[in-house]
Amino acid sequence: MGNTVIEKIIRHNTGKDVKPGDIVTVNVDRVMIHDIFIPFVGDKFEEMGFTKLWDPDKVVLIYDHLVPASQVDDTRHFHKGDEFAKKYGMKNVHRSDGICHQLMTEAGYVKPGDVVFGTDSHTTTYGCVGAFPPGIGYTEMASILGTGTMWIKVPETIKVVIEGELPKNVMSKDIILRLIGDLGADGATYRALEFSGSTVENMTVASRMTIANMAIEAGAKCALFTPDEKTAEYCEIELNDYQKSLKGDEDAKYLRTITYRAEDFVPVMACPSQVDKIRDTSVLEGTPIDQVFIGSCTNGRLEDLQAAAEVLKGKKVADYVKLIVTPASRKIYLQASKMGILDTLAEAGAMITHPGCGLCCGRAGGILSDGERVVATNNRNFLGRMGTSKVEIYLASPKTAAACAVAGKIVTPEV
């Protein structure tokens, strides 16, 4: 019998033939720790009795949730992180370069077929290049830092096939939101999602990142895309035989297969306050809004900003509506600036902020108060995430979000 992509990655890593449900120990290729968890990881690492990192070059520390500090306690996280990095010889430290999940792929830390762990649930993002990237807690991370290994249970795989050409006003965000709605918030718990089909093949790596990023919102352990020439170009590598083999075999055993026609997708939103509460944008039209946020590790990439700029070009943000745009990384910020994208956004009335997690995690300027309503491109709309527990958060694509900013209410984008 053939293998799924996740089975091939684990088999290559461990040297063992594996099947779903097997518990194995994997060798870790890279880890990521962000500023929220570094104090706890560091304390637990030393509490466990470790005196050195298994491989300092394979450890990446990224400050993104708390930069620049907006609360006094935030600086403690930076001090603890810097102390830990200096003490244990870590060189891969990013203090103001952008969001962890953007930087891990953008800076070349993750390659196709790698096994990567991160202290964040959206570590699943790296599946966009064909890596296996589970999110873990700080205790597990401390153990990896000392040993370079971690146990996992081999997940079952749900195959998602998408064929055809997407409508012009639909983005990959609409695809993953629809899938989450169909599966439910726990419909893929501890399972791998494996994406294929002509629509997927034609996607940019950035679009695949959006889908992989939000896979956890259906409970998935990972979302995997077969490495191709786009992947190789993005990662600035030539794919080796192992990486080229990372596609599901025809006779592989899948838990189930879900098939979509690309032409059937329409702009959708996740309604307050559940990510799997999906509605067509058309049935929500006319709902007044107070703010729009375009950014995050889900939709803060160059193509996202460009899509928003195309909608906003020559237009103005509606009166009494605030538009906040946060690029996912410094590199994206500079690219968007050179291309005139930031000018277009600013001329339309957008407030453009420094790269980072920003409003998505409610730690930067732009939080909302009771009764306010925001359309946002991030990945979660839980109660209290972007302000008080009485804020309504609607999740949407950058095109939809930009169109709503101009209209001052929920609308369906035309292009």
For the regions a protein language model found, what residue spans apply to each?
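Fe-S-dependent hydro-lyases/dehydratases of central metabolism
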Residues: 1-415
